[in-house]
Amino acid sequence: MKWRANMKFCDMPYQRIDFAEAKKELNALMEEFKRAEDAEAQFEVHKKYYKLTDKVSTQITLASIRHTLDTTDEFYEKEQAYYDEKVPEYSNLLIEYQKQLYHSPYRKELEKKIGPVAFKNMELAFESVNETVIPLMQEENALTTEYEKLLASAKIEWNGEILNLSLLGPYLKSKDPKVRREACEKQNEFYLSIADKLDEIYDKLVKNRTEQAKLLGFDTYTELAYRRMQRNSYGQEQVEALRRQVKEYWVPFSESLYEKRKRRLNLEHLYFSDEQVYGPEGNPQPSGSPEEILAQGQKMYCELSEETKEFFDFMMENQLLDVFGRKSKAVGGYMTYLPDYHAPFVFANFNGTSGDVDVITHECGHAFQGYLSAKDPIREHADIGMETA
């Protein structure tokens, strides 16, 4: 894949998207699409659409990544707030273009090029967004960003150190029950200190999403959420059947495992602080420092195949894995994608637990998919459903 240009993440230039200019470009594409006289000409316009949306997506994603890398950075906090407001309007513009594509007189030929799943996903998108819900989508974005920053603000005192939620993780899984209990209490103290704010955000989100669903013609938010998650081949009935089977078969099995764990830990009662520990000697621990774990991950991917070696070397060379825990980082982990650089990006918070190894397989598995699909000229093919998360 020599076509893929190398650029370190820190060197990727950021420029705020001018959505008025993006709208102008998109409107010009829609006019050109209308004038196109056959499927081939319309597909050439669609390739220009890819280029425009890749440019916009790259800058939005750069801002989002850099905001989560340091939630105290005022510049990227403002950029995130800007996109929280502007992206819903932009998403609605994209729907207008997609409607032209969907209703093209050359639909059959275009479907052969782009694939039928893309058109099915367009149907779901048409039902998920319109102008009436844009203000609510803007509010929803602001609330989720506020929630993310609230969790990242944790400053938990622990043996003379100040830890965030991610860095407290190892103590929640300590083999010493007293340490586990104390860590849980410290974590709970933090959540209780922000309980009123959490309740407020949750209440606003429930009301917001319910109102969005009603405005779009649904009885509940569940129906809207299925469409936004691109559940294009099954519905609520199938999920309800799965839940019944989980309750009937998996819950009793899970309870039996908890009973075995209680005996293994020599406990009369399994408390909430014991739920993350599997044996009296504690959980399996990754061997080595965070840097050594990452190096071992690179060795593993090098040995798997030529493709995985090429992928992980690319990620390492271009600093596309920011996985070491820091106090100002957002909580959790994710993989995202920077289309202009054909580059996946992995975010995580290594904290010395087995979760560090999970990142090397789970999030890097997503990144490998993104890396491989980057060469596919049909961008819709990279648009995988939520089931793969």
Segments (PLM) and residue ranges:
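Short beta-alpha connecting loops at secondary-structure transitions
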Residues: 345-349, 376-385
